[in-house]
Design a protein with these regions (language model features):
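Catalytic NTP-binding/metal-coordinating core of nucleotidyl cyclase/transferase enzymes
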Residues: 419-420, 424-498
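Hydrophobic ligand-binding cavity/cleft-lining segments
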Residues: 1-46
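Cys/His-rich short segments
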Residues: 230-298
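N-terminal accessory interaction module
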Residues: 292-398
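Beta-strand/loop substructures that line and gate deep hydrophobic ligand-binding cavities in soluble
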Residues: 81-135
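Regulatory cytosolic signal-relay segments
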Residues: 374-375, 379-431
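Intrinsically disordered, glycine/charged-rich C-terminal tails and inter-domain linkers
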Residues: 555-556, 562-606
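Catalytic core of nucleotidyl cyclases, primarily class III adenylyl/guanylyl cyclases
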Residues: 52, 437-438, 469-497, 501-542
């Protein structure tokens, strides 16, 4: 009888390997689409070294195994070794490769080696792997090709409706109500199709920016649609807390007040401080009255679980290994799992260095910096007495995540979900924001000259104009203070552009003329989010400084801090509108910051 069963499956697909990798190397999705059962973590059993103990139940038999970390090199190969502690299999190894062909296709080779542990294994392996898995794998590969061509990668692999007749009627009714308030007919149709035909894995965590990119659509418009869909009971929103290392979910809450300032990642066994600018993102899921989405884990360690990691390999204790690698230019980190330090790696087209040589010692060494060309040899040495998991990962944060910092500066969110605030006493870092304060010069005399009712009408009109222009420039009105507003933006340029447009529009409307003129000040820097009077507000030195800048405006002028003025995007924008503005640099002390003088820049809108 055979001691090892070996299988080699081969496919040829139309897409380039980088594109097909996103589905094929998503082993959680692939296992789901090929009818494998959900898995569970066996918390009571400790794995050896780097491995984890997992289990599933198939045909009434509980199978338990010890799984080593997946190994991969994006987008060319991945594999895993499983050593079984119960069930009909003793050991199984999977190894997959993707190779580009001269005619633009991708050759896929999927190899499996399985060792039976008993008589049942000799019977089950040929049936399950040699026949059933081969059939299911081929079906999934064919469907993936179709989905990529049709740009429907989130749709159920067999394009089956997931809704009952009652659920369809309920969805249509709510979608019709949504359309009355959010005039995005084609987007709503696509969203309905996604909710009806999307698979559970895709719908368990809807990222609006990810969907926008897949549909070739505007990110902010998709976010707006999802927010309105939540308001009308089509979707529910959640706040996901992400681990800074593996970037996986560590917690989910439905309201900002339920966020804790500290969190723990079980997978990485690390504690971390939660912040708004990276570690909290808004996601959506269908409202359960329309569709119940239930997703278990089908695989917990495949390449697409941590897609920012382009390389992951186990290096045996005392071993030295070489790898030929090819990655796109950018910033990366080279780390050993469990280590506190990371080596910085910059891949640069202009570099003539084609070798990266790193030694991991028993004690963490200081972080080093390396520069290599896109094609390089990686020589890695593990001089410790334990196996090491060596990782190369992109340092750039998740591009498809709509972070809490960004969402909190989105006007639609503040209009629809003003009740979403932090718990009192809880503060979250939001990274750097552009903070804007305005005031109206001449408002006091206006009230005296034309009367309270007429003057108040002017002020309200000016608020509406500012709010709309701020929103159009990706900012949000945080609060009004008398005749003034406070607004926040992710980018200084957007804040400046909104004020230039506001001065012009107010002037055209007749508000920013005569004795009533707009004053504004903008500063950019670190801030924290707080609950102030049941409003999601910002606090810190950046806010305090920004609040004091508009006093230097003489009307129709925007005061910029030096940080804002020297921002690259701001500099380019000022060159674009140089015929519309006049710039003057001034030096002055600022109240509350008396120990130093500041360079400020008056931007007069002509």
């Amino acid at each position: 009888m055979k001691n090892i069963f070996k299988y080699h499956f081969h496919w040829r697909v139309k897409q380039p390997k980088e594109q097909f990798w996103t589905l094929f190397a998503d082993t959680n999705r692939f296992n789901h689409d090929t009818h494998l059962p959900t898995i569970a973590r066996e918390e009571s059993i400790n794995g050896s070294g780097l491995s984890k103990v997992l289990s599933f139940r198939k045909y009434g038999i509980k199978v338990v195994w010890e799984e080593e970390p997946f190994e991969w090199n994006f987008p060319e190969q991945f594999g895993v070794l499983r050593k079984y502690l119960s069930g009909p299999i003793k050991e199984m190894q999977v190894f997959c490769t993707l190779k580009s062909t001269a005619d633009g296709f991708t050759e896929i080779d999927y190899k499996v080696e399985a060792t039976p542990s008993n008589l049942l294994g000799y019977i089950a392996i040929p049936i399950q792997i040699g026949f059933l898995s081969k059939r299911d794998f081929s079906r999934a590969i064919t469907q993936y090709e179709t989905k990529l061509v049709e740009k429907k990668v989130l749709v159920d692999v067999f394009n089956r409706s997931q809704l009952s007749t009652i659920e369809k009627a309920r969805l249509k009714k709510r979608a019709d109500e949504l359309l009355k308030s959010c005039d995005q007919h084609s987007r709503i149709d696509k969203l309905i199709e996604l909710i009806e035909y999307g698979d559970d894995i895709a719908l368990h965590k809807i990222r609006p920016y990810e969907i926008a990119d897949l549909w070739g659509d505007d990110r902010k418009e998709l976010l707006k649609l999802c927010l309105f869909a939540t308001r009308f009971g089509v979707l529910d929103l959640r706040w996901d807390v992400l681990c800074p290392s593996c970037r996986g979910n560590t917690a989910k809450v439905t309201h900002l007040e339920n966020l804790d300032s500290h969190a723990h990642c079980d997978s990485c066994n690390m504690d971390f401080t939660v912040n708004f600018h990276q570690l909290v993102e808004i996601t959506f899921i269908p409202n359960p009255s329309i569709r119940q989405v239930s997703v278990g884990a089908y695989c917990i360690g495949g390449p697409q679980v941590t897609p920012h990691r382009v390389f992951q390999q186990i290096i045996a204790a005392g071993a030295e290994e070489r790898f030929q690698l090819s990655y796109s230019p950018g910033s990366y980190a080279v780390v050993k799992a469990g280590s506190k330090n990371a080596h910085l790696l910059r891949i640069d087209d202009s570099s003539q260095n084609h070798r990266l040589d790193i030694i991991f010692a028993a004690e963490d060494t200081h972080s080093l910096e390396f520069v290599v060309s896109p094609q390089f040899e990686f020589l890695v040495t593990n001089s410790t007495s334990n196996d090491a998991l060596v990782i190369i990962e992109r340092t750039k944060w998740i591009e498809t995540a709509a972070t809490a910092a960004e969402v909190s500066t989105f006007q639609t969110f503040r209009d629809l979900f003003s009740h979403q605030v932090l718990r009192k006493g809880n503060a979250m870092a939001v990274g750097s924001l552009a903070i804007l304060f305005t005031d109206l010069k001449g408002s006091t005399s206006l009230y005296r000259n034309v009367g309270d009712a007429t003057a108040f009408g002017y002020v309200v009109d000016h608020f509406e104009i500012l709010k709309q222009i701020v929103s159009n420039n990706d900012g949000a009105l945080i609060k009004t203070i008398g005749d003034a507003i406070m607004a926040a933006f992710l980018k200084p340029k957007d804040a400046l552009k909104s004020m230039v447009e506001s001065v012009i529009q107010l002037r055209e409307s007749g508000i920013n003329s005569g004795e009533l003129r707009l004053k504004a000040g903008i500063h950019y820097g670190y801030a924290i989010a707080v609950n102030l009077n049941n409003n999601l507000d910002y606090f810190g030195t950046t806010v305090n400084l920004a609040a004091r800048l508009e006093q230097f405006s003489r009307g129709a002028e925007i005061i910029l801090s030096e940080t804002v003025f020297t921002d690259n995007e701001v500099s380019l924008y000022l060159k674009e509108i140089e015929s519309l503005v006049k710039i003057e640099r001034i030096e002055s002390a600022i109240k509350g910051f008396d120990e130093e003088n500041f360079y400020l820049y008056r931007v007069l809108v002509l």
